[in-house]
Regions:
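Short gly/ser/thr-rich secondary-structure transition/capping motifs
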Residues: 24-27, 118-123, 169-172
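Extreme N-terminal, non-catalytic leader segments
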Residues: 1-40
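Short coil/turn connectors at secondary-structure junctions
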Residues: 38-39, 66-67, 133-134, 165-166
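Short glycine/serine/threonine-biased micro-segments
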Residues: 37, 46-48, 171
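Generic detector of well-ordered alpha-helical packing
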Residues: 74, 141-142
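Conserved P-loop
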Residues: 41-130
Length: 209
């Protein structure tokens, strides 16, 4: 029999404690059911801000755990970003960082060049995905290359499926293909509510760059 007093006689503080206790028990049961321990595939997509930012946050977390990490940026190649400046200054064998893109396709206006850059980026990414030394791999803006068909989805799905069992992979970019979403463990879709750019505010260092 519960030692809790009837709810109608509880004080607001007692009701709050009861609600929090029920919530804790529910969360504890969910945690107890999660017994599988393996690498996960995370996909960040959508038209909102935060896809790459989330990926780089997980990169920082992984480095903090002492993981061997690899980054391949498929698009962002013609302008400097704060994340690249920060992570490149880490003088550690923990991190391999590659910026392979030549900018967005409307900047190059050269499809053959864009395809070549994407294929070169994918070659490095595929090596990382096959290498058990890498605990965490971030493939930033790979979805853009998939949407443009500069990299073939079948290649990516095969490499992800065959990767070392404890390797975590994060893929970012809008327009994630359905086939990638289907095999991912965690998928987050960022949605725009408001964006400063629409009000004429240019991209800001520390926020977008």
């Amino acid at each position: 029999m519960s030692n809790q007093p009837p709810r109608e006689t509880m004080t607001p503080e007692e009701r709050h404690r009861e609600r929090m206790q029920r919530k804790k028990e529910l969360i504890d049961r969910k945690i107890a059911r999660a017994t599988i321990d393996r690498g996960v595939l995370v996909v960040n997509t959508g038209n909102g801000k935060g896809k790459s930012s989330s990926g780089f946050g997980m990169l920082a977390r992984s480095l903090g755990h002492g993981f061997k990490c690899g980054v391949v940026q498929f698009i962002k190649g013609t302008f400097s970003t704060g994340e690249e400046a920060f992570f490149r200054q880490l003088t550690s064998d923990q991190l391999d960082y590659h910026v392979m893109g030549e900018g967005f396709t409307w900047e190059t206006q050269d499809k053959a060049r864009d395809i070549a850059a994407a294929q070169a980026a994918w070659a490095i990414a595929a090596e990382m995905l096959a290498n058990p030394d890498y605990d965490f791999v971030l493939l930033d803006e790979l979805n853009i290359a998939l949407v443009k068909q500069y990299v073939q989805l079948e290649q990516v799905l095969a490499a992800v499926a065959a990767r070392p069992p404890r390797q975590h992979v994060v893929i970012t970019g809008r327009g994630a293909p359905d086939g990638l979403v289907a095999v991912a463990d965690t998928v987050t879709e960022m949605r725009v509510v408001k964006h400063a750019f629409d009000a004429g505010i240019k991209a800001q260092k520390g926020v977008e760059l």
